[in-house]
Amino acid sequence: MKRWKRGAAMLLCLCMMTALLAGCGRGRSGESTASVVMTGSVSTVDPAYATTPAERTLVLHLFDNLYRWTAEGAVPAAAHTYDCTDNEDGTQTYTFHLRRDGKWSDGSNVTAADFVYAWRRLVSPETDSPEAEILSMVAGYEDAHAGDPEALGVYAEDEHTFVVTLSTMCPYFVDAVCTAAATMPVQQKAVEGGEGWSASRTWFVGNGPYRRTGDWSDSLFATLVKQEDHYNARQVRADRIEIRFKSAAEAAKDAGTADAVIGAAGEDGTYGGSSTVGVLLINQMATNMDRTELRQAMSLVIDRDAAAGTLGADYAAAEGLVPHGIRTAGGEEFRAVNGAVIDCEADTYTDRCSQALELMTQAGLRRPEALISLGTVTLLYRNTPAQTALAQRLQKVWQEKLGLSVTLQGEDAETYQQLLSSGAFTLALTELDALYNDASAYLDLWRSGDTRNYALIYMNAYNILMRVAAASTSAEARDAYLKDAEWLLLDTANVIPLYEKEQAYALRGDVTGVVSDGMGAWYFGALWRVEQ
């Protein structure tokens, strides 16, 4: 199993604050300039459409949400305080009090109406944002997403008071939703000023600590300059941030010279959290897969390190359904706190295969004629080169270790999604991505009746655990319920985690203050160089 140096940037930032107290430098000149290299490119900085780590990283600098995620957790940003009220009908009302000195880059005031407009726009079917579901906990979301944006439970009580009603309790609402790139405010005048407003020097307006300058047409380079009139300008350490977007191979060459390299790091790099988890789904309605022992055996014989290696260097064996980088309600990393649910160690693989054979015996499936009685077992997957290679590896290991024959069914993206979402499969490979940083983003999917429960799983005990977790007012209790829910789900082996995608990064030795959201996006405004 790979032994990478893992780093939650939040912890990294905290650990190095002591060094900061000993002495700080302003960099190589009077102006503090941060040099950053990221993999990928940027096609938009419109919060409703920014989906890649590079795009969301720029959004985090050009806009301010109600709160901002930092090394100390969620801290006030566009809002300076909020109140939360539990209503008699089970809903919750959050009242955010916006700071009066919040400004757009055109000098106008940031108001509650800007947030109302942005959130309604995000969920509107006309916008067709891939991030719309991040507001699914807001009252009226279903009606709003169906075509009536004004049904969304948000309104401006006055210019500086933004009110949100949630249909149910949502413990991660402030920390994960109100800090996200997707839910940033946008100015209606700017958005409606012209198509492609977010890429237009003429029409773009942001309210963040930085503004973009230089050549806006260059998708491989972005220069960000501190907004001197930003309310928090004194706390923004980097006066200028220069971000170059490169391929992984090219970016890796900058490790050690650039202040931060994100998405590539070379042999000595650190790996941080991303939001992607690859899983094998076993349809609960497939009668030939109804024996728990069979499903557990299929999981045990999978060499997850080898499976991850099939996909590339940025993939690692999954230790659970919730990947590294995802936080608990208490702000710690869920995986670090709860440990591995799945044994991926190379030195125990032989024992796991022996255990799998014992399970096959218990299921009455050791004899060839018994396996034949299962009929055709088909594995559905997208016919990309990487997923095809993974499917072939699984097919081979199940045949060699269990004697189980599996037929491969590779489909184009559209056909694959139709079959997956309709439950027309026995086995299926898929990837899960979270819209917000909370374990429930991976665990809510498998509640009975959830439209994303493609494996058609029904477990009453699991449903109860998830309901109790959602209603819990104790962060510690909620984390415990989610831990139990993950264990229960994986023990039934209808959802089998295979790999997680991680993000390599390298910080120059004298750099501190860089913060990751745990899902691939970064904030460099607090970047500082420690005096050597």
Task: Show where each model-derived region lies.
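N-terminal lobe/hinge region of extracytoplasmic solute-binding protein
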Residues: V37-D89, V205
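Aromatic- and charge-enriched surface segment that lines or borders ligand/interaction sites
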Residues: T81-I134, V163, N288-D290
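Alpha-helical secondary-structure segments
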Residues: T111-A118, E159-V163, D239-R240, S275-A329, ...
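Gly/Pro-rich hinge or "lid" segments in bacterial periplasmic/extracellular proteins
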Residues: P149, L166-E242
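Extracellular/periplasmic solute-recognition and catalytic clefts
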Residues: T213-V225, V236, R240-A286, D305-L311, ...
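Ligand/substrate-recognition segments at binding pockets and active sites
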Residues: S217-S219, Y349-C353, T361-A434
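Detector for C-terminal structural segments
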Residues: V301-E332, A386-Q395, L420-Q532
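Structural transition elements
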Residues: Y315-A363, T384-T388
